[in-house]
């Protein structure tokens, strides 16, 4: 009798552990890439991470691009300062310039070796707009997407890498100058996208709240999202341009209804 109880407890524990393991395996591993941006990428990453974790559906890691190390200088002596102060300042500048050179060389090596696309994640959230990546890193990013990885751009990430053809293909449309690829907009009356102005550059107006309209109701990404919903006060990009190949527009909004 005791043996039966022990076995029952054993199997109950085993089932619980297995169920826990399966639950853990179902979590989607996501990577946030940041480190440079024309917006406050630190706060944005914190917000993205908190949002993803709050769903209970994701594991989240963050990979920050190599950072520039700043070496603070000191103000040089005035013209009428004693010679010993001038000599001391010259010596300091020689030391500082040497340190800056070493730091630059070290940083270049860091950039060369930095590659967040390790294949351990199912999706990468790109909160980055800055320096061009090393060729190997760019190739890894392309291969990641080619193998089915998800690439999600946050705001100014579509400003990045204008001259990287593969990136333009992956994102479809981005913040680009006039005559760069096609400018795609949504024709409300015909309920389909169309090629718009040739000579218009990407941009945005003043920050304002705007209504988002879902255009692909049956798309899995839009599941359980209202047909129309209000977005808070924010910048809304317009005249996005690019190759626009294999592009599906899921939603749209007016940058300016007029």
Where are these regions (language model features)?
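Hydrophobic h-region of N-terminal signal peptides that target proteins for export
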Residues: 14-23
């Amino acid at each position: 009798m005791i043996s039966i109880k022990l076995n029952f407890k054993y199997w109950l524990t085993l089932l619980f552990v297995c169920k826990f393991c399966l639950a853990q395996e179902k979590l989607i591993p996501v990577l946030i890439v940041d480190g440079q941006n024309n917006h406050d990428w630190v706060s944005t990453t914190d917000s993205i991470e908190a949002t993803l974790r709050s769903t209970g559906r994701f594991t989240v890691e963050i990979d920050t691009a190599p950072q520039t190390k700043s070496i603070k200088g000191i103000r040089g002596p005035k013209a009428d300062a004693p010679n010993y102060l001038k000599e001391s300042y010259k010596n300091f500048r020689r030391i500082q310039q040497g340190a800056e050179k070493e730091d630059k060389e070290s940083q270049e090596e860091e950039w060369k070796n930095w590659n967040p696309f390790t294949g351990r994640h199912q999706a990468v959230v790109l909160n980055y707009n800055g320096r061009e990546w090393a060729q190997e890193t760019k190739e890894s990013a392309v291969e990641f997407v080619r193998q089915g990885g998800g690439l999600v751009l946050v705001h100014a990430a579509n400003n990045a890498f204008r001259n990287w053809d593969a990136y333009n293909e992956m994102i479809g449309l981005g913040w680009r100058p006039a005559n760069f690829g096609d400018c795609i907009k949504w024709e409300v009356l015909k309920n389909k996208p169309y090629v718009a102005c040739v000579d218009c550059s990407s941009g945005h107006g003043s920050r304002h709240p705007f209504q988002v309209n879902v255009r692909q109701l049956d798309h899995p990404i839009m599941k359980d999202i209202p047909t129309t919903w209000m977005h808070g006060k924010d910048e809304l990009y317009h005249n996005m341009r690019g190759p626009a190949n294999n592009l599906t527009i899921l939603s749209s909004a007016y940058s300016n209804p007029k």
